[in-house]
């Protein structure tokens, strides 16, 4: 199955509330090869938030609210700092990579700027 690249504005109704929630959670750098710090899987903190985010994300692609679908979804908050103080520096453009054994991935920016 192939999914198109999409950009969806205003994913959360109240992104500032979600951002404040995210900033209150503990972060660490356990395993993985990724920049910055990451929370534990969000379902460990709030299963309802995890489910609502997951179903909203999947609904952008299809009607995944049908009982015959079974999906394994991991959700995290991640803090990543700029690699350069100059926000236009090419070092801050991104980190191209491939997630192994992943069919679909997404991200939501909660940066206020």
Please tell me what each predicted stretch does.
Residues 1-113:
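Fe(II)/2-oxoglutarate oxygenase catalytic core
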């Amino acid at each position: 199955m192939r999914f198109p690249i999409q950009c969806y504005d205003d994913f959360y109704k109240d992104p500032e509330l979600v951002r404040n929630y995210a900033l209150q959670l503990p972060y660490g750098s356990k395993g993985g090869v990724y920049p910055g710090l990451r929370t534990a899987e969000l379902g460990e903190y709030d299963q309802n938030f995890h489910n609502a985010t997951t179903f909203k994300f999947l609904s952008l692609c299809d009607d995944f609210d049908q009982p015959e679908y079974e999906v394994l979804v991991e959700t995290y908050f991640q803090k990543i700092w700029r690699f350069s103080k100059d926000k236009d520096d090419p070092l801050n453009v991104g980190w191209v990579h491939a997630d192994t054994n992943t069919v679909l991935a997404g991200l939501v920016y909660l940066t206020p700027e």
